């Protein structure tokens, strides 16, 4: 029943992310925390709230908090959106209300974010979090503390997070709290990107030395105080790097025989199950238990967008929520199997009642634990602990209000999403039968396993093919491509004027006319090739030739010109490796930047080829009733000077 739902749950239910108003509130709340001055904040409120239909939500909720919020939103949104006729009747009053309501809404939004912060964050400091968590520990629950904050951008950021994590380990290790019930010892979760400003595959050598040393210091203290450590999962491109780092530290004498150094695996990743198999083999070889938190995944929206922008052939994650749910159960079944028991200690993190029940049914032992987020799944896990007598650990973020935003937005997206189990659970309009459907049945009910509403990255543009990209952060893909590029690195390229379709480079180089050697900017000892520079005679000949060819080219159909651009795009993609090698050697670009440059050139060609429809002739009716045909004509010969930093 809605009346029993906490006020934040009621607000999220009424303004869910499948409504325009819910999306507006999310955008507004997210943006307001970034705006330092009141005037700009009020202008944003005035702009955003005037376009929504707040009246339709009035009295839909039984929550006084929600209805009061709706009245405030109506006051700001509707007054700003009044027509000129309505404004004329009481313009002065309306202006007064407008000025009053924007600051009120601003303060209310900031206060709402703080209220939601208390819902999802256990404390501003580790000491406050431990104090606030005592009531749950008295009930038998335990915690995994994590310090709020996103990726470090500087060494100073990384040093700050290092001190925060060290302080958390010290506090947890020295905690003298004794539970009246059997509450397992708390642990600490660590986000690797917070500990190094260059936690990326391109800087693998630095990560496996500098970040490894930093993490080793934290682990050393954790082992001394016997505080379990879990490495958080992050973006798909960092998966292999995180596994290399984990393996390097896991095989050291520092953690040998400890069995409390673990990590997080995300089930929405198509590589999740193979990674579990690899970790199981690693644990068998080393002989030490690996605690492993299995989650659904936290970066789905970003992974989809990044893959589309990068032009990958496919996505690293499943595109249907039902597929992720099935993958989670498949991973859970593997983790509970006899071949894994004793090697990996499963920690199942989920707020889906069906998932929790399925795990309880499929297991034949109790060597695992459940996990949930602070502020979510309270009633579910109160029941689970009582019904299954299984330990439950609460993932509890710790930090100040200013560090809350990114984490809070992820939680609101999870809670507010229309497909979220948590969202549907508190929605009285959702039939119970829908909540209890098996995810396998739900997945098989679709015609395709992939989500047809999410096109593959190559087909993301409706009017043209996306340019092809290479994921150089995935070893299996990067190794093959880098080998292709290496095959061209010793090439000696030549360049020179091309006049009337004929290259003069070879003849000019033989005659040593205006020839210069080209060397790599990153190492002048590397000779890339030779270039023969044009003189004034060449320039004149080129302009004369282009001018002579202009009439024929101008008469050429737009379709033929567009086909030439498409052909050029295809040829550049076919020769991607060599073009990347040239960009790398001649301009000193990284492989990643070189791939991006080729992709941009390809996309330009395809984009302008598709503009052909806009260049066709069209009819115009004159004032005399006569029909006239309007057409576009070429303007003549142009000189184009390409930018030095984008040579392709």
Model-predicted regions and their roles:
Residues 1-468:
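Positively charged, amphipathic and often flexible ligand-engagement surfaces
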Residues 7-11, 28, 524-527, 545-546, ...:
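A general alpha-helix detector
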Residues 29-36, 137, 169, 173-176, ...:
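Structural signal for hydrophobic packing residues in well-ordered secondary-structure cores
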Residues 111-131, 136-146, 153, 217, ...:
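Catalytic cores of nucleotide-enabled group-transfer and carboxylate-activating enzymes in metabolic
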Residues 223, 254, 284, 336-340, ...:
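Hydrophobic alpha-helix feature that most strongly marks membrane-spanning transmembrane helices
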Residues 399, 403-406, 410-544, 548, ...:
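Terminal low-complexity tails and localization/encapsulation signals of metabolic enzymes
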Residues 644-648:
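Conserved coil-to-alpha-helix start sites within the AMP-binding
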């Amino acid at each position: 029943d809605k009346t029993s739902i906490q006020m934040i749950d009621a607000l999220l239910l009424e303004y869910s992310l499948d409504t325009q108003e819910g999306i507006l509130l999310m955008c507004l709340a997210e943006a307001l925390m970034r705006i330092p001055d009141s005037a700009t904040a009020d202008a944003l409120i005035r702009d955003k709230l005037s376009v929504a239909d707040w009246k339709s939500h009035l009295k839909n909720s039984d929550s006084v908090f929600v209805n009061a919020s709706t009245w405030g939103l109506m006051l700001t949104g509707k007054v700003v959106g009044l027509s000129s006729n309505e404004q004329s009747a009481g313009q002065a009053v309306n202006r007064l209300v407008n000025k009053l309501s924007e600051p009120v809404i601003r303060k209310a939004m900031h206060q709402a974010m703080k209220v939601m912060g208390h819902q999802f964050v256990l404390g501003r400091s580790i000491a406050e979090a431990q104090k606030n968590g005592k009531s749950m520990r008295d009930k038998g629950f335990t915690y995994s503390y994590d310090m709020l904050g996103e990726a470090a951008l500087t060494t100073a950021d990384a040093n700050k997070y290092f001190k925060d994590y060290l302080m958390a380990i010290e506090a947890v290790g020295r905690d003298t709290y004794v539970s009246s019930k059997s509450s397992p010892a708390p642990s600490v979760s660590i986000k690797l990107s917070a500990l190094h400003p260059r936690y990326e595959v391109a800087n693998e050598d630095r990560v496996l030395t500098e970040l490894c040393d930093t993490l080793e210091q934290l682990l050393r203290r954790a082992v001394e105080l016997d505080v379990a450590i879990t490495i958080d999962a992050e973006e798909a491109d960092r998966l292999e790097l995180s596994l290399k780092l984990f393996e390097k530290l896991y095989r050291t004498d520092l953690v040998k025989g400890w069995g409390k150094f673990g990590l997080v695996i995300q089930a929405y990743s198509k590589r999740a199950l193979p990674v579990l198999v690899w970790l199981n083999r690693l644990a068998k070889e080393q002989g030490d238990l690996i605690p492993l938190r299995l989650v659904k995944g936290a970066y789905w929206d970003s992974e989809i967008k990044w893959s589309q922008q990068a032009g990958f052939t496919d996505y690293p994650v499943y595109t249907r929520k039902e597929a992720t749910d099935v993958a989670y159960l498949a991973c859970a079944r593997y983790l509970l199997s006899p071949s894994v028991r004793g090697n990996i200690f499963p920690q199942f993190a989920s707020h889906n009642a069906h998932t929790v029940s399925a795990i309880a049914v499929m297991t034949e032992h109790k060597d695992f634990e459940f996990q949930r987020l602070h502020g979510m799944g309270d009633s579910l896990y109160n029941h689970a602990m009582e019904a299954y007598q299984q330990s439950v650990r609460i993932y509890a973020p710790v930090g100040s209000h200013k560090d809350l935003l990114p984490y809070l937005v992820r939680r609101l997206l999870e809670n507010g999403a229309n497909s979220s189990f948590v969202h549907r659970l508190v929605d009285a309009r959702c039939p119970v039968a829908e909540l209890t459907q098996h995810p396998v049945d739900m997945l098989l009910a679709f015609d395709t396993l992939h989500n047809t509403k999410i096109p593959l990255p190559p087909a993301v543009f409706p009017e043209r093919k996306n340019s092809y990209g290479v994921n150089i952060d995935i070893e299996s893909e990067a190794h093959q491509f880098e080998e292709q590029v290496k095959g061209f690195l010793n090439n000696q390229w030549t360049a020179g004027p091309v006049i009337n379709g004929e290259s003069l480079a070879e003849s000019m180089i033989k005659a040593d006319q205006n020839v210069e050697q080209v060397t790599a900017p990153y190492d002048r000892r590397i000779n890339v090739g030779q270039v023969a520079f044009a003189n004034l005679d060449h320039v004149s000949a080129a302009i004369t030739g282009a001018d002579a060819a202009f009439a024929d080219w101008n008469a050429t159909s737009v379709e033929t010109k567009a086909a030439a651009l498409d052909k050029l795009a295809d040829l550049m993609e076919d020769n991607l490796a060599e073009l990347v090698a040239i960009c790398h050697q001649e301009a000193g670009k990284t492989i990643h930047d070189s791939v991006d440059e080729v992709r941009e050139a390809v996309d330009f060609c395809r984009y302008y080829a598709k503009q052909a429809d806009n260049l066709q002739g069209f009819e115009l009716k004159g004032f005399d009733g006569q029909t006239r045909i309007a057409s576009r004509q070429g303007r003549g010969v142009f000189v184009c000077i390409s930018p030095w930093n984008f040579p392709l």
